[in-house]
Design a protein with these regions (language model features):
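Catalytic cores of enzyme domains
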Residues: 25-214
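Leucine-biased recognition of intrinsically disordered, low-complexity hydrophobic segments
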Residues: 9-10
Length: 214
């Protein structure tokens, strides 16, 4: 856990409900600001987490994923502070069983993609609002489908102004980031049953003094 004379500032956003014919879910957000160097000291372990990336099909196949052509620590230390943002998604029928694993995976992909689209857009808007800032998305790139990423053809990214790495791609421990800094335990589906909630962990690197980010 973080050991510091100054505790990170935890902010909690009121619940947001989304009710549509296709789905119903509730979103709850928490955010915390911490010094970048302290966050690196406590949660950065690229030697360990790069191994998980290498086991993923997105490794070296997506421009937002490793390996990178820059030093991640130098990239991070351009900014003095980092906001960690935890977005909890509570499905309205969290105990609902699915007939097959494939149906469950499709549901999860559709739900998380929908929330990611809103969250990524918000983070890019915040970059424009606060100069000298950089977002980290909650997962791999969603601007292109994996098979259409230009990296597969050794070509430059077609969305260089939008693409952002995730914390895990930069080598951070997301499980302990969520539990220690946000008080959120990461949950997963099991036996084709939805968990109580899903969690997206994104971040906002900045040199600005921001009282409330989201």
């Amino acid at each position: 856990k973080v050991q510091s004379n100054k505790e990170p500032l935890l902010k909690e956003k009121p619940v947001f409900n989304c009710n549509t014919k296709a789905d119903m879910y509730t979103i709850k957000e928490k955010s915390v600001c911490i010094n970048t160097d302290l966050y690196i000291k406590c949660y950065h372990n690229p030697q360990k987490f790069i191994q998980f990336c290498k086991e993923c099909k997105m490794y070296n196949s997506c421009w937002s994923c490793p390996p990178f052509d820059f030093d991640t620590k130098t990239y991070l230390l351009k900014h003095t502070s980092i906001w960690i943002i935890g977005t909890q998604i509570f499905p309205s029928q969290f105990e609902r069983p699915f007939a097959t694993k494939e149906e469950l995976i499709l549901y999860e992909q559709n739900l998380l993609t929908k929330v990611r689209k809103q969250l990524d857009s918000l983070l890019l808007t915040l970059e424009n609002k606060y100069p000298e800032s950089r977002a980290c998305f909650a997962g791999t790139c969603h601007f292109c489908s994996p098979s259409k990423c230009k990296r597969n053809k050794h070509l430059p990214c077609i969305y260089p102004q939008k693409i952002r790495p995730s914390l895990e791609a930069l080598g951070f421990d997301i499980e302990h980031t969520a539990s220690d800094l946000l008080g959120i335990e990461l949950l997963w589906s099991k036996n084709n049953i939805l968990p109580k909630y899903y969690t997206l962990v994104s971040a906002f690197l900045t040199n600005n003094k921001i009282k409330k980010l989201v």
